[in-house]
Structures are given as C-alpha cells and as structure tokens.
A protein has these predicted regions:
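Flexible, D/E/H-enriched segments
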Residues: 1-87, 118-220
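Short, hydrophobic/aromatic alpha-helical segments in well-folded domains
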Residues: 30, 88-92, 108
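Beta-strand elements within well-structured catalytic alpha/beta cores of enzymes
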Residues: 74, 101-109, 179
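Non-transmembrane, aqueous-exposed alpha-helical and coiled segments at domain scale
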Residues: 90-103
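A structural signal for small-residue-enriched, beta-sheet-centric alpha/beta enzyme cores
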Residues: 111-119
Length: 220
C-alpha cells in the first residue's frame, strides 16, 4: 500500500502522512486458511487496494516501518467478545508457527478509551494522568492491568476482562487479546516492560509496553 494518509478522526494533527507499506500475502493467506472448515471464526485475507487504511497502522508504520520488511495489518472487529479475539489470535499464532517467518506482533491500541464531552475536550488535551482520565476508576483499572503485565500475569488480565471492560478499553482490548493469544494466551509468561510513561488525554489512557520473549519460550 502506498499513498498519503489524513486521519478522519485527527486531521489537525495527523495529515498527509506518506506511507509505503509492503504486504505479506503469503502469511495473510496462511492465516485465512486457519479458519477453513470452522463455524466459529471467519477470516478474509483482502488485497483490495481500495480497502481503507487507518491511523492505528500508519502511526506505527511511520516510526517502526521498513520498506524492505513485510508488513501486514489485521482488523479489529468490535462485534467480537473476548473469546472471539482469543480464538483469532490463536489462529494467527498457529499460522506463524507453520510459516518460515520471524514475526513481531504490534498490538496498536489504547487502554481506557472514553472521551470527555465536546466542550470539555480543549481543557483535557495535556498528557497529565490521572487528571485527564474520564474516571479515576478507569485509571485504577489501567494501573491494575499494567501491574499484571509487569508480572507476566496474562491469565489474570484475560480472566479479568469482564471487569476491565467496564473501564471502556479501546476496541474491547482486542488488540492485546489477539496478540496475547498468539503468544500462548493464559499460559504466556512474558513480562511487560514500559517503553514510555503512561499518558492521559481527553479522557483516554495510552502507554507503550514491550513483551520480550522469555528464554525458554512464550509459555516458559
């Protein structure tokens, strides 16, 4: 995919961003094949050049992309529940294992993601936390998840999703759930290392977390 991207959500701050993203149709087709014969998951590997591209892809690509490295984006279906995200992530992991690829999974999405109303937004654009989180309880929920990340307690995060969803994580936290499932799901023991400070803006919470592969494997 090549072109320039202006975000319909953030045109003031993200406009005419150039991108030149090489795809990986072989891996996409391999992931699609994981759903063959199943009635609990449907996967489409789309190479339609008119399929819209979104800032969750372009923003990450701008900083981490390499024109010589294959890159593939995966949609997050907000009709899914936790089990759906877990299944899809597991199938992605299966496809990667069947391939000859060395793959980095980037879960591009935020934590609590409820916005203040329109009149309040201009007063809440700084990155000060927890003042600019919509509700202090949502901030506390984010901190609880980050604490579990730091301990490698992915089972605790996954099992706690019914409660955490009350804090309105972006995309029902599907970006994390798919990534975690590809790495072993509840059995994954990779600890999370903060690569940034936790930031809050207009009601929402964001942070960068890196999960290094344990020496003995993702579920060691």
């Amino acid at each position: 995919r090549q072109g320039k991207f202006t975000s319909s959500e953030l045109p003031r701050g993200m406009r005419q961003i150039p991108y030149d993203i090489p795809g990986d149709p072989e891996l996409a087709k391999l992931i699609e094949a994981q759903a063959e014969g199943r009635d609990d998951c449907r996967i489409l590997a789309s190479d339609d050049p008119y399929l819209p591209i979104y800032y969750g892809t372009v923003n990450i690509w701008t900083f981490l992309g390499d024109p010589n490295t294959a890159w593939m984006s995966v949609a997050l279906n907000q009709c899914c529940d936790t089990d759906d995200f877990q299944l899809f992530g597991k199938l992605i992991g299966n496809a990667i294992e069947q391939s000859d690829r060395r793959v980095v999974l980037l879960a591009s999405g935020g934590m609590t993601h409820r916005f203040f109303n329109f009149k309040e937004l201009p007063k809440r654009e700084s990155q000060k936390a927890p003042d600019n989180i919509f509700d202090r309880a949502y901030y506390d929920a984010d901190m609880g998840v980050l604490d579990k990340f730091g301990k490698g307690d992915h089972a605790g995060v996954i099992d706690g999703m019914p409660e955490y969803r009350k804090a309105y994580p972006e995309g029902h936290f599907g970006h994390y759930l798919m990534m975690a499932a590809a790495l072993g799901g509840r059995d994954c023991t990779a600890t999370g290392e903060l690569f940034s400070e936790y930031e809050a803006s207009v009601g929402t919470g964001q942070v960068h977390v890196w999960f290094e592969r344990p020496e003995g494997g993702w579920t060691a």
